[in-house]
């Protein structure tokens, strides 16, 4: 009986797990986000003059949808965006564009639709303000977070 319950639970988890990740196309400077609920781009250093961006959906949508956020184009109206700065202690609602400072490290967080979806990835900007993935740090953090999760 114990094995039947374990098998049923594994089957349920395999069928209910959805793809919640997000990707950055460095060439196009576009984020592709699967099943978005909340998305944020914030500087790693809280004393930096860079802005933090929090993205929320204005209207509910189907779960199986991919949202796109262009870093070099105008922000679409389907997102409610809050731009804030810890350096100047001010915020703006619905800015037109995303302004990333050159030579700055960023943390991008995705809270997806589903239970306990909270993904963090690390990026940096080059001297021209283009965002790039910090692959060595992302791999290190992902392996450690898996180990921590398995040890609980």
Where do the language-model regions lie?
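Extended, polar beta-sheet/loop recognition surfaces of beta-rich domains
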Residues: 18-21, 30-32, 36-38, 113-152
